């Protein structure tokens, strides 16, 4: 049985109070706290430390680029002074953004970065000390300042593998304080994905719903699972609470989360879900073993 609670504070002004709110919250047993950062980004706090996943806190691809933001970042990179570790899933700029990572690394000088080789190359070229970057072995648990993190392959949109360097796209299973979290990064469902993830009883998962189509692919917007696939994956894996991602931030690559909620309800009206807004807190509490 699971119990989860949430607040609904929304940060409407850039950076106002969010770091202070993260720092002030105390996390008890069998619990984790999550704050949405937009796109797939999330800050996760356990009893000790704060883990960030794919923080994209600038408009790097909108300023002169083709993918402007639909809302400002809830934090500025230089404000992130509490990061113990940062997980990066792949090298696309809305997931591995040097203009976010470098100021963040200076504001959190003890932080480490877990990333696939593609993201590592991007960050080393941008000037990040390569000694702070860990390229994980897929399937091998890694201790990172509190949680245990296991990298799993993601397919965006094909399952790619370099025999010398590994997988360019990763997801992560995070085990921390009695709670198991799956963060997919960007992915589609691929052969073997369900079998890989079935090794864990996943309490909470972050999975994209923006889908893919011919016209976005032609504009070099690479797709992900759509709302139907994510709902069905949630049921197959019996995920305790599903948080859809990758539907809100980038102009021309948004998706109506209401379609996901409707399809999930049609699939299983008892399945817990949460639309996590930027700056909003989700406090997840595991009452007992599943």
Predicted regions, residues:
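Active-site HxH/HxHxD metal-binding segment of metal-dependent hydrolases
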Residues: 74-142
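Zn-dependent metallo-beta-lactamase
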Residues: 1-52, 57-61, 66-67, 236
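Structural motif
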Residues: 49-51, 84-85, 147, 179-181, ...
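Active-site environment of divalent metal-dependent phosphoester hydrolases
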Residues: 60, 92-96, 120-123, 140-143, ...
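Pre-active-site segment of Zn-dependent metallo-hydrolases
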Residues: 48-88, 98-106, 159, 189-199
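Divalent metal-coordination and catalytic microenvironments
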Residues: 44, 54, 90, 97, ...
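Cap/insert and terminal regions of metallo-dependent hydrolase folds
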Residues: 112, 118, 188-278
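Metallo-beta-lactamase
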Residues: 7-29, 115-179, 263-288
């Amino acid at each position: 049985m699971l119990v989860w609670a949430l607040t609904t504070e929304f940060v409407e002004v850039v950076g106002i109070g969010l770091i202070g709110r993260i720092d002030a919250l105390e996390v008890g047993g069998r619990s984790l706290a999550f704050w949405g950062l937009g796109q797939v980004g999330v800050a996760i706090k356990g009893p000790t430390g704060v883990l960030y996943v794919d923080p994209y806190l600038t408009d790097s691809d909108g300023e002169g680029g083709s993918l402007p933001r639909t809302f400002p970042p809830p934090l500025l990179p230089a404000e992130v002074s509490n990061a113990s570790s940062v997980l990066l899933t792949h090298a696309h700029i809305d997931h591995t953004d040097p203009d976010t990572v470098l100021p963040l690394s200076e504001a959190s000088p003890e932080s480490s970065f877990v990333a696939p080789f593609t993201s590592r190359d991007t960050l080393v070229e941008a000037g990040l000390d390569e000694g702070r970057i860990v390229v994980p072995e897929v399937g091998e648990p890694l201790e990172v300042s509190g949680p245990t993190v296991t990298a799993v392959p993601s397919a965006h949109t094909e399952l790619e593998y370099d025999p010398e360097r590994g997988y360019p796209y990763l997801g992560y299973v995070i085990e921390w304080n009695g709670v198991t979290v799956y963060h997919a990064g960007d992915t589609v469902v691929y052969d073997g994905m369900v079998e890989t993830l079935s090794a864990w009883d996943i309490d909470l998962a972050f999975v994209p719903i923006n889908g893919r189509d011919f016209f976005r692919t032609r504009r070099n917007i690479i797709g992900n699972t759509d709302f139907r696939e994510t709902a069905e994956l949630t049921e197959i894996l019996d995920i305790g609470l599903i948080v859809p991602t990758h539907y809100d931030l980038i102009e021309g690559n948004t998706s109506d989360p209401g379609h996901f909620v409707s399809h999930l309800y049609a699939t299983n009206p008892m399945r817990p879900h949460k639309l996590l807004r930027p700056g909003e807190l989700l406090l997840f509490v595991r009452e007992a073993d599943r």
